[in-house]
């Protein structure tokens, strides 16, 4: 049992070590600094399923450390929650495939309201529609689940 637990921990460590940390992270931080701290906006985080759960954790953690952030469920956004999104905000859209329909639709709806809101994508697919529409794509790699 201890060997299995250690193996799981080792796999998690390897996955974290293999996350690319080139200049892209700096670009994402620049967007967040500009939108949240200089323009007094907030980070809007969204994802479906497991990606949504991760997004909720990100938004909660950022808010608790003083960086205004909220999670919006992409389906709920289409039914009234878009009013939370303001012109100085930034979007963090999370989808492992980068093809999640609701996430792509959310981007379309937000751009119709505020066409200059920057999108930061968190995805495992650099060739996806989500990666293409984003200003910054944080590629997670393809770690084993």
Regions found by a protein language model. Give the residues of each.
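Glycine-rich phosphate-binding loops that contact phosphosugars or nucleotide phosphates
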Residues: 33, 42-145
């Amino acid at each position: 049992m201890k060997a299995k637990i250690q193996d799981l921990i080792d796999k998690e460590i390897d996955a974290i070590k293999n996350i690319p940390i080139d200049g892209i992270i700096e670009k994402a931080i620049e967007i967040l600094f500009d939108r949240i701290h200089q323009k007094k906006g907030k980070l809007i985080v969204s994802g479906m399923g497991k990606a949504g759960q991760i997004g909720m954790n990100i938004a909660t953690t950022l808010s608790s450390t003083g960086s205004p952030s909220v999670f919006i469920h992409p389906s709920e956004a289409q039914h009234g929650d878009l009013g939370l999104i303001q012109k100085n905000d930034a979007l963090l859209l999370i989808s492992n495939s980068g093809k999640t329909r609701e996430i792509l639709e959310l981007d379309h709806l937000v751009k119709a309201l505020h066409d200059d809101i920057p999108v930061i994508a968190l995805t495992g697919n650099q060739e996806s529609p989500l990666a293409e529409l984003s200003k910054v794509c944080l590629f997670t790699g393809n770690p084993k689940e």
